[in-house]
Amino acid sequence: MKRQNEEVKREFTVGFQPIYPAQRLSHHSLNRIIHEPSASKVAYCGFAVDAGTRDELENEQGMAHFVEHLIFKGTAKRKAWHILNRMENVGGDLNAYTNKEETMIYSAFLTEHFGRAFELLTDIVFHSTFPQREIEKETEVIIDEIQSYEDNPSELIFDDFEDLIFRGHPLGRNILGNPGQLKLFRSEDAAAFTSRFYHPGNMVFFVLGNLDFRQVVRWAEKLLADLPAVAGYPSGTRHDWQPGI
């Protein structure tokens, strides 16, 4: 097991190429770019945002996952269906998921469509508008998702176990939130959450594919140069550990 872990660590480190704003991306503060070369014709890229359930305030339970849904529902220049079709039209895929510690927004595509994927990801991650009508729709979608989990004992038992272990700590919360809190969310709440966490200094951009690293950097400089230079990690989002049992 130890040898296997060492191999995984070695393989990851080989593809890890950090970007330091003062040297490369002087107009903003993208925390890292991770580039893993591959000979495959299919490539992947995305943003790993350092924000999950653990970072939610008491009145934001479920917000990290909620925002993950909402970023697909419209930006300043795209409607929801434009977002969904942008990669599907060239045989690509766009997806996301949330866990207790981070949110991943990513795309799979043929290598020649890297620019299209990167531009779309940048648009939804940094320029989502959170229309109130879409919030109301997604609230019902997520409540249905919660109810489906509650009908599945094998899933529910893990939530109960984490609640017991991390009692009183945000890590013990259900990633999906609770119906009562979800119904209170408004557009400005989603905007406030993303303003704290969805900035370059709090995320990593990752690329896997047959792409030159310098090409990736050029695209990053082009697409991210106009973003505000907010550096580092948000304050007040980490919590002292305490045993639940």
Predicted regions and their residues:
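Charge-rich, well-structured scaffold segments of protease-associated domains
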Residues: K2-E7, A80-W241
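Residues that recognize and position ribonucleotide moieties
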Residues: Q23, A64, K183
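Solvent-exposed coil/turn segments that connect beta secondary-structure elements
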Residues: S38-A39, G52, T75-A76, L110, ...
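Well-ordered beta-strand positions enriched in small/hydrophobic/aromatic, beta-favoring residues
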Residues: L25, I33, C45-F47, I105, ...
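His/Glu-based metal-binding/catalytic segments typifying zinc-dependent metallopeptidases
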Residues: I34-A39, G46-A48, V230-I245
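N- or domain-start disorder-to-order transition segments that initiate the globular core
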Residues: K2-R3, E7-V42
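Extracytoplasmic
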Residues: Y20, S40-Y44, K100-E102, P200
